[in-house]
């Protein structure tokens, strides 16, 4: 793919929005064929996978791929033979490298690892710029919010897990490393900090745009209602979790601003942007989303899928082509009242619970992604589920990785959790190992990593 700067990427996004449906479909096919051709010529893995692929192939002719297989073949998967997973993992061993460019060429990002070992991904500068172009062109559902953001100093602060090479964290850190003068306009607060520290940072920074996980922002709304948090954002953008109608209204009423969300993932960046009708419109000039059932068969519009197959049309260094993502969506092609002709999806998001502990007669609430971010660092854990019960009793359901001792894994996870809770002022906690493995809800079929078992 030709080198593309962020301005050109923005122009390409705007140009696409003016195309007819026929032109859009043709562009998507061209980009898919160019990507597949490049992957066959530069990736040993794809060269073998596509060895019998006809020249006039369609999207459905391409075999599906998945994280486990691609990670097992990482060195052959990428299209730059100088890239080696061992070198990238060594680079990731230094947290100072978050947001830095590996070999001065690639930003390194990783998934959260909710379904086993995390994916390690690399983005060249063109891929970074296209992600930035999509964000700059389509992030704001309402033009007046963008204007208000610009008018109020363009100051942004996000609250999320900042200790890893995650997409949001790495992207912000990268911008701050390359443009250090942006520090007065862009900030990050860790979701792992005690709430009073986050509140102080936000009060000092006074962001015009506030971002973060819905569950954490809900706790910040309570801080504002109690008079401790005093900020006036013009827009709130959430991500990483499902944004319920109740939380959306609570945030809007508390901060007196518009609240919106988006659908992003490590493999595809901003997959879909929310419109004023709260529909997630797919950025289908750069990404292809296929809803499928458990066996990989197409799911019709209006039906909840078991997963999706995602094709990223702009990452040439590490092609994600019909890549399995375990998010469940409902696809729509009917017209949306906002005027955006791109298909839109309903997304079944994460539904983990806010929990609460009591220390010295004080109730301390904890956002679920804070607990999740701590425990995913225990690499011997394949899956986990934390049940928070009354009297600060925590039941931990775990599934350890192959060749790892179950009791040792639990002790590591328990220590990580207790150390984190201590930073929140919670020291009286009893963590026990459950005989039960992590499991879905017997009725809804939904899986929660963090489950509240008490009334709060």
Q: Where is each model-derived feature located?
A:
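Residue-level signal for inorganic ion chemistry
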Residues: 39, 111, 156, 210, ...
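Adenylate-forming
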Residues: 190-193, 197, 207-248, 260-267
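Short, hinge-like loop/turn segments at secondary-structure boundaries
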Residues: 175, 228-229, 277-281
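AMP-binding/adenylate-forming catalytic core of the ANL superfamily
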Residues: 210, 314-317, 321-424
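Nucleotide 5′-phosphate-binding alpha/beta core
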Residues: 1-110, 117-137, 144-151, 204-211, ...
């Amino acid at each position: 793919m030709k080198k593309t700067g962020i301005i050109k990427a923005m122009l390409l996004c705007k140009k696409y929005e003016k195309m007819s449906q026929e032109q859009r479909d043709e562009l998507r096919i061209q980009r898919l064929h160019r990507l597949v051709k490049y992957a066959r010529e530069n990736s040993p893995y794809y060269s073998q996978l596509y060895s019998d692929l006809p020249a006039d192939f369609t999207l459905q002719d391409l075999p599906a791929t998945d994280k486990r297989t691609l990670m097992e073949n990482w060195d052959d998967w990428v299209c730059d033979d100088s890239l080696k997973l061992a070198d990238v993992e060594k680079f990731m061993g230094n947290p100072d490298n978050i947001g830095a460019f590996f070999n001065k060429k690639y930003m390194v990002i990783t998934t959260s690892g909710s379904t086993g070992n995390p994916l390690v991904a690399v983005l060249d500068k063109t891929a970074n710029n296209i992600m930035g172009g999509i964000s700059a062109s389509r992030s704001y559902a309402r033009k007046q919010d963008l204007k208000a953001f610009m008018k109020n100093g363009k100051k942004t602060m996000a609250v999320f897990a900042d200790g890893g090479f995650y997409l949001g964290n790495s992207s912000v850190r990268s911008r701050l490393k390359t443009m250090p003068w942006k520090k007065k306009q862009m900030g990050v607060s860790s979701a792992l900090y005690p709430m009073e520290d986050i509140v102080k940072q936000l009060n000092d920074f006074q962001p015009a745009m506030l971002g973060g996980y819905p569950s954490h922002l809900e706790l910040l709304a309570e801080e504002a209602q109690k008079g401790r948090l005093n900020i006036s954002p013009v827009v709130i953008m959430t991500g990483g979790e499902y944004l319920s109608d109740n939380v959306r209204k609570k945030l809007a009423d508390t901060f007196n601003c518009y609240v919106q969300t988006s659908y992003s993932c490590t493999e595809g960046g901003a997959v879909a942007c929310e419109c004023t009708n709260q529909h997630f419109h797919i950025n289908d000039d750069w990404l292809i989303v296929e809803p499928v059932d458990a066996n990989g068969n197409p799911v019709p519009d209006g039906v909840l899928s078991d997963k999706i197959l995602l094709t990223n049309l702009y990452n040439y260094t590490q092609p994600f082509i019909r890549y399995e993502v375990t998010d469940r969506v409902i696809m729509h092609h009917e017209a949306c009242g906002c005027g955006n002709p791109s298909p839109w999806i309903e997304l079944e998001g994460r539904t983990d619970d806010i929990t609460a502990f009591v220390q010295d007669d004080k109730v301390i609430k904890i956002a679920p992604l804070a607990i999740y971010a701590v425990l995913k660092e225990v690499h011997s854990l394949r899956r986990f589920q934390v049940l928070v019960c009354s009297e600060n009793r925590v039941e931990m359901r775990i599934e350890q990785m192959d060749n790892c001792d179950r009791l040792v894994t639990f002790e590591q996870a328990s220590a990580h959790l207790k150390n984190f809770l201590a930073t929140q002022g919670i020291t009286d906690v009893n963590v026990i190992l459950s005989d039960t493995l992590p499991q879905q809800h017997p009725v809804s079929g939904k899986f929660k990593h963090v489950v509240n078992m008490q009334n709060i």
